Amino acid sequence: MKSARYILAFIAFIALYYFLPMNTRLLWQPDETRYAEISREMLASGDWIVPHMLGLRYFEKPIAGYWFNSIGQWLFGNSNFAVRAGVIFATLITALLVAWFAMRLWRDKRLAVLSAVIYLSLIIVYGIGTYAVLDPFIAFWLMAGMCSFWLAMQAQTWKGKSAGFLLLGLTCGMGVMTKGFLALAVPVLSVLPWVVAQKRWKDLFMYGGLAIVSCVLIILPWGLAIAAREPDFWHYFFWVEHIQRFAQDDAQHKAPFWYYIPIILLGSLPWLGLLPGALRSGWQNRGHHAAAFYLLCWIVMPLLFFSMAKGKLLTYILSCFAPLAILMAGYGIQSAQKNIIALRFNGWINIAFGITGIIATFVVSPWGPIKSPVWAHFESYKVFCSWAIFSLWAFFGWYTLTDSEKRWPYAALCPLGLALLVGFAMPDRVRESKQPQFFVGMTSEMLKPSRYILTDSVGVAAGLAWSLQRDDIMLYQQRGELKYGLDYPDVKDKFIPAASFTSWLNQHRQEGIITLVLSVDRDEDINRLAIPPADAVDHQGRLVLIQYLPK
């Protein structure tokens, strides 16, 4: 009976965090709108080999992540939950692997369940795991690779070792097909310190070739298919998306070496108090507990690798938090039995975070001291939603202090208010600039009959395309991340330079309504834009709709 209650509580936990709130949050540009539209076009065209966005070739990532996202939209239709269904599934399956691996290592059901709960409630895991990007998929394949390598090295027969390495190759191959060759670098770097410490070179060299073979066999069918269809894909994907993005001086998203330190700290909420002890236990047990050191290697080595790369994004280190959750669960149980100082420290951190959020909400509210508040006066209810988010965080932090020895796991409920209310608390000024669905909802009657729609933002273009279910949105003035796709001669008409817009407008105006959607500064005078006089203008915050009727 008690176990049934725990199962029901866990199901409710997943439903409240990962299912119920998804349709209350609009899609973000550029990431969510991009992946939503690529997968929608894949379903609409039936082309499961070459990814396209806005009808243009899109070679920034391989295909597997789009497959899973497309299946989500195929199953659940045209909804925000459908767009996020793939990453939610990947996150939940990763949590299942976390629990299974913890059980395999320590044979402790409580530790296994707590590992999964901690993983799912980590703020960085929850944030990325409900956000339609490809990183939750690669995190799953890396976790599966972590499990596969361990199984292979612990197997006592040649059949078991062979199966483990073949499975490792499969996970690496799917990782490559999801996000690229980083899915090969991260596992190799992660296992090397453990192999050296355990002196397991013999097994690695004897069976490692099987992983290479299975990895190649997984990649080969699609790799050959896209090479036949688009011969320059692999050159662009390897050179631009890997070498330039991560290593060269002009890498995208350049950041200093220490960039990930604050992300690790904030991402560990609401379990930050367990972080130092969890890492320390993994290091202290390296000599007599191979599993703890193995987990530590899968945290530290990817973190060092991504820290040394010139290009950095917070999503890159998502895979580090799966092994960290297991170490945190083990350290939490140990602390409850021996010394609850770390558990109480964790409770106070959550109280402090909640109180800080409450104060910060007031400061940026319409009643606060700043001149440009985040929320306008008519958005007062959103301020109260924000206060509720941080009040719940502080409340559950306090609740864990009332009996830290038994109630410390309730820290998993600290982000509950965030999960349920963040969509309602979002300021209109953010929606107007970062969530194109808000703009489409306000201007749909003008957008739908348009023969041509042009915009100067790729993220907005993808949002318009997905919301309106059309892939013929054109780019105006700026090409952004679609520059490479627009260089193909068969799609030159998809981009209109600002200098050519007047002549293009005169040529196409008789074909139907032409709508221009532009990003502008909040205080910019749209009457001074260097475009022909319009028949209709609708200004929505940072976006302005400019419409030309046939003449």
UniProtKB/Swiss-Prot annotation:
Coiled coil: none
Subcellular location: Cell inner membrane
GO cellular component terms given for this protein: plasma membrane
Catalytic activity: 4-amino-4-deoxy-alpha-L-arabinopyranosyl di-trans,octa-cis-undecaprenyl phosphate + lipid IVA = lipid IIA + di-trans,octa-cis-undecaprenyl phosphate
Main location: membrane
Pfam families: PMT (PF02366)
GO molecular function: 4-amino-4-deoxy-L-arabinose transferase activity; mannosyltransferase activity
Record bears the keyword NAD: no
Entry EC number(s): 2.4.2.43
Protein family according to the UniProt entry: Belongs to the glycosyltransferase 83 family.
HAMAP family: ArnT_transfer
Name of the protein in question: Undecaprenyl phosphate-alpha-4-amino-4-deoxy-L-arabinose arabinosyl transferase
